[in-house]
């Protein structure tokens, strides 16, 4: 239990002082001889008696006493009145007692329980009021008895009266403060309760309660059986069969274009149904990466038997027969759950036949060790499509038997790959028929094998095409391939070397000497090259222009083509194809005319960066002009016969020249160096139109080459990649 050092502490201090003052007044004479309430002529008066100061005698202590009768002149009241009032001096001890009780109550106000109780403070306040009245009464008695001879003992009672009054005020303030706090707390509590009540009411109103009438008494789970027959095919097991009428087309079931519903399959004939096809989970990946039947249809698409399997079987497993029909003739019973070809060319196999297989001429069966061989030794003969029908097998347009598709089929190499077309040549071999140009139309071309047997172009053999073949009447005749069959005979490559002379003589436009010509297959683009061939005897065109610049449209040399080069050199032929280098050059030919100033210009930005040509004299030529008939410089003379260049017209010794060192067939007499031909004596004929730095000055006389022939072209003019002033 502790004290609260608040307003109760001040109250306690005030009451203690008031109690002390009153106690001093009560302890006056005759209790003590020093403290008196009043004095008159050698007598001192107190609460309980009086004392004579001179002789030191005191009256017995008691309530009320009789004053000295001898001298009544000194007091305001007569002696009888003063004797009655002397009995009221007993109020001093009573007032002191009340003050003591109030002091104790003020001390208890420091305790937690009484201090927080407004009733306790109210009791203290009520008790302080009589205490104050008693103290005030004691002071009044003193004044009546001892005035005008009141001593200091009477004045301290006045001080005690004032302090008791102050303590009453403090008690009132304390109670008011406590009551205010309690009222404030109560108000706060009431406000909080109201807010909480409002919140609770709002929270309760946010819930909606359903009545018991809307709540079902129990839950019911119903199972409804669907009678929709359109969904029956989606739940068919894998071993079930769906039979269709003969010739009825259900839908496209090819792996190349499968639909969403693959539960029904086509029937090739009305003899035997097929097993349902399962959709491969890798269909989309195969369609994205490869085209259907990239290497052609597999041999096991055509119901052919192989080692360990009968006809129409699937790798040793007999075909599945219908549950309500007999087994086809020549076949044994099939086990449960087996899948076979069922005499249906639409069957693609389990993995769409992605394994590559080698090609070969008809009769080799194009068998693969992974897919089984056809017509193995001692095995059952193949059961192909022609045995199932009375007439010849008919395939739709664009569909071919396995192994008989052309090599350059657009479907062979996959999407985005364009095969290079083969050049059709006119064979010069006796007995070979010329190849006619292709006939315009939608039918694909044919392909001829090495053995000379024509075979149709297969193209993209998909199951859609097989379905079309299944719908075709069996007695219909097959469509003949456009353009007819072509028979090519094999001719060794070296045999064409002996035929080049005959072909050259046969295809030559007119007899006569021909200028020296180069193989232009390796020439690069030159905008100054002439479009027309050089005339015989033209020295400047054959030497300056033709040797270094060449012509745009030169015939393909006969020595580099195996056979039938006439179709290539003939521009009017539909099979004419310009050389690749010519196509490359034509793509860079400027549309506008080229200025002649480019002939003396250079790509170098400064003259100091250009090489010095000591033999270049500008457009005016060397001083003194050119000498007619001057021989070429030593570096332009031809090599000796034993060091021939080995070209087609140079006659080298055992270097692969034409006719092994013999004279070239088109070699003719060349005009003398520096002139000899009409219009070729100009000094500008020696200028190379491509670059002035490559010009050279002719010599004044010509020395015959060692071991050479007159008119032989110098070695430096064989190609512009050779010589001291090469164009590279």
Curated annotation (Swiss-Prot):
Chain segments annotated as coiled-coil in the UniProt record: none
GO cellular component: cell division site; growing cell tip; plasma membrane
Start-end of Gly residues biased regions: 644-660
Transmembrane segments: 11-31, 88-108, 121-141, 154-174
Membrane topology, Cytoplasmic segments: 1-10, 109-120, 175-728
Extracellular side: 32-87, 142-153
Bias kind Polar residues: ranges: 383-392, 495-507, 516-548, 556-572, 596-611
Composition skew (Pro residues), residue ranges: 319-332, 630-642, 662-672
Compositional bias ranges of the Basic and acidic residues kind: 274-292
Keyword Transmembrane helix: yes
Similarity-based family: Belongs to the palI/RIM9 family.
UniProt function note: Required for the proteolytic cleavage of the transcription factor RIM101 in response to alkaline ambient pH.
Protein name, UniProt field: pH-response regulator protein palI/RIM9
């Amino acid at each position: 239990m502790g004290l609260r050092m608040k307003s109760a502490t001040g109250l306690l201090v005030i009451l203690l002082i008031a109690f002390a003052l009153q106690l001093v007044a009560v302890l006056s004479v005759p209790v003590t001889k020093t403290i008196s309430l009043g004095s008159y002529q050698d007598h001192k008066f107190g609460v309980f008696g009086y004392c004579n100061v001179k002789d030191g005698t005191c009256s017995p202590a008691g309530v009320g006493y009789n004053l000295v009768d001898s001298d009544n002149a000194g007091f305001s009241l007569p002696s009888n009145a003063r004797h009655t009032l002397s009995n009221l001096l007993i109020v001093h001890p009573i007032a002191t007692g009340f003050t003591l009780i109030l002091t104790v109550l003020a001390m208890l106000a420091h305790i937690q329980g009484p201090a927080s109780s407004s009733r306790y403070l109210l009791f203290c306040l009520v008790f302080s009021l009589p205490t104050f009245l008693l103290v005030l009464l004691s002071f009044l008695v003193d004044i009546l008895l001892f005035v005008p001879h009141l001593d200091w003992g009477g004045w301290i009672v006045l001080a005690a009266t004032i302090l008791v009054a102050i303590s009453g005020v403090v008690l009132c303030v304390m109670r008011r403060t406590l009551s205010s706090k309690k009222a404030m707390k109560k108000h706060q509590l009431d406000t909080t309760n109201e807010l909480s009540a409002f919140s609770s009411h709002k929270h309760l109103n946010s819930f909606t309660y359903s009545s018991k009438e809307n709540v079902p008494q129990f839950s019911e789970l119903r199972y409804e059986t669907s009678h929709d027959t359109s969904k029956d095919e989606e739940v068919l097991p894998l071993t079930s069969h769906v039979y269709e009428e003969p010739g009825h087309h259900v839908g496209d079931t090819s792996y190349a274009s499968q639909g969403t519903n693959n539960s029904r399959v086509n029937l090739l004939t009305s003899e035997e149904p097929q097993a349902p096809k399962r959709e491969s989970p890798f269909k989309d990946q195969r369609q994205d990466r490869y085209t259907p039947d990239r290497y052609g249809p597999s041999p096991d698409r055509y119901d052919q038997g192989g080692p360990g399997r009968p006809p129409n079987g699937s790798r040793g497993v007999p075909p599945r027969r219908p549950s309500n029909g007999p087994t086809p003739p020549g076949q044994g019973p099939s086990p449960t759950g087996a899948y076979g070809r069922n005499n249906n060319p639409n069957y693609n196999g389990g993995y769409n036949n992605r394994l590559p297989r080698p090609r070969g001429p008809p009769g080799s069966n194009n068998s693969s060790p992974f897919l089984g061989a056809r017509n193995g030794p001692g095995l059952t003969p193949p059961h192909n499509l022609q045995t199932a029908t009375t007439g010849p097998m008919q395939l739709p347009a664009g569909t071919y038997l396995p192994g008989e598709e052309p090599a350059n089929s657009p479907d062979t190499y996959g999407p985005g790959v364009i095969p290079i077309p083969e050049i059709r040549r006119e064979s010069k071999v006796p007995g070979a028929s010329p190849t006619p140009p292709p006939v315009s139309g939608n039918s694909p071309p044919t392909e001829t094998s090495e053995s000379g047997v024509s075979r149709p172009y297969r193209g993209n053999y998909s199951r859609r095409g097989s379905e079309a073949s299944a719908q075709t009447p069996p007695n219909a005749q097959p469509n003949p391939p456009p353009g007819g069959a072509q028979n090519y005979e094999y001719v060794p490559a070296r045999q064409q070397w002996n035929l080049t002379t005959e072909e050259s003589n046969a295809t030559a436009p007119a007899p006569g000497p021909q200028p020296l010509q180069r193989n232009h297959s390796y020439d690069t683009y030159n905008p100054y090259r002439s479009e027309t061939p050089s005339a015989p005897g033209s020295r400047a065109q054959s030497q300056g222009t033709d040797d270094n610049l060449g012509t745009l449209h030169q015939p393909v040399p006969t020595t580099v083509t195996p056979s039938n080069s006439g179709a290539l050199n003939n521009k009017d032929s539909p099979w004419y194809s310009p050389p690749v280098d010519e196509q490359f050059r034509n793509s860079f030919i400027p549309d506008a005319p080229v200025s002649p100033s480019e002939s003396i210009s250079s790509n170098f930005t400064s003259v100091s960066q250009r090489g010095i040509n000591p033999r270049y004299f500008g457009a005016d030529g060397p001083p003194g002009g050119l000498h007619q008939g001057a021989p070429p410089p030593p570096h332009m003379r031809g090599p000796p016969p034993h060091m021939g260049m080995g070209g087609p017209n140079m006659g080298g010794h055992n270097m692969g020249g034409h006719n092994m060192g013999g004279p070239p067939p088109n070699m003719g007499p060349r005009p003398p160096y520096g002139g000899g031909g009409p219009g070729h004596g100009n000094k500008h004929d020696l200028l190379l139109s491509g670059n002035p730095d490559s010009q050279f000055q002719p010599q004044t006389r010509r020395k015959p080459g060692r071991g050479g022939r007159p008119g032989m072209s110098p070695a430096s003019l064989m190609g512009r990649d050779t010589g001291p002033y090469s164009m590279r």
